[in-house]
Amino acid sequence: MSVDISVIIPLYNKGEFIERTLKSVAVQDISNWECIIVDDGSTDASVEIVKEFIRVNPGNWKLISQKNSGQTSARNHGVRLAQGTYLAFLDADDLWPSNKLRLQFGALESDRSAVLVLSAFAIFRDHNTTARVVRHRDPLKMNKRWLLMSGFGGGLESVGMVRRGVLLDDELFDSALSTSSGLDLSLRLAELGKVILLAEIGLYYRINAGQWHADTNELGRNLDILCERYQNRFSQNLARSHSAYLFWVSARGYGTRYLVVSFVRSLFTLRNGRLSILVNLIWRNIASSRLGKSKRSETVSAISKLDR
């Protein structure tokens, strides 16, 4: 059976969440997809949960196992097995609204010059509390500079869909970047063709204890690599994006430690650190927004239906 979309889910010790994640794929309102789950040597009940889900919910599911090599390796493994024209990635603890694949598939099908589509996403904590929706206010003005400034491409792992034909075997997710491989791939794709940004929410992004965000030093190391890699390839000063990204992460509630580290880092790595922080923080607030009461209730309700 031919498929248009390959969904790739790297899995490592997400037994608490993986069934809900798979359920959000199963309820997509189009059926032209396959789902490849790549287990990265889980030591909990994740694999057994996936097998039972597939037994009860027959469909185009594939469970692959590999020796523990990291999420990036698992994603790349899935890409190499994929049969679809398009690739969509989903982390094993995140959720998709039911129209995610249809909207992104339609966007790429209607514009053959586009290589990547990204959607807005809602951030939520356990207990279904939505913190913010991150979106661009004018999708028609999406370009490479905005992608770079905003760091939005860091969400490719769950929020994007890419045209598989533009990826080469040696240019997939970079295994040297444990926390920013999605942003790196987005930046490379932005050099190859058009990037579409949809205003509709395409991801419910879960914040929970134990995420990589807890390792500020590793995040900083990854972004240092990206600064060196891209500073001469884009007109926008990537150092500012680097600093602003760390600051933005802290502002999203990932912890006081982020706030202190990113602020100090900004002051000492930029010539005009305070101004850069102010300008980029204003930019971030333009690019994202808190939900109004009715929309918040609607989004929380949608998450609640999936996250149980």
PLM regions: where:
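Short aromatic/hydrophobic "clamp" motif used to bind/position activated sugar donors
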Residues: 87
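Conserved donor NDP-sugar-binding/catalytic core segment of glycosyltransferases
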Residues: 99-131
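A conserved acidic beta->alpha catalytic loop
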Residues: 24, 31, 39-49, 69, ...
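N-proximal low-complexity "stem/linker" segments adjacent to membrane-targeting elements
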Residues: 1-26
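Cell-envelope/extracellular polymer assembly enzymes that use nucleotide-activated donors
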Residues: 3-6, 34, 184
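C-terminal subregions of glycosyltransferases and related glycan-biosynthesis enzymes
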Residues: 191, 204-308
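Glycine-rich, basic loop-to-helix element that forms the pyrophosphate-binding segment
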Residues: 66-82, 103
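Conserved nucleotide-sugar donor-binding catalytic segment
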Residues: 80, 119, 138-223
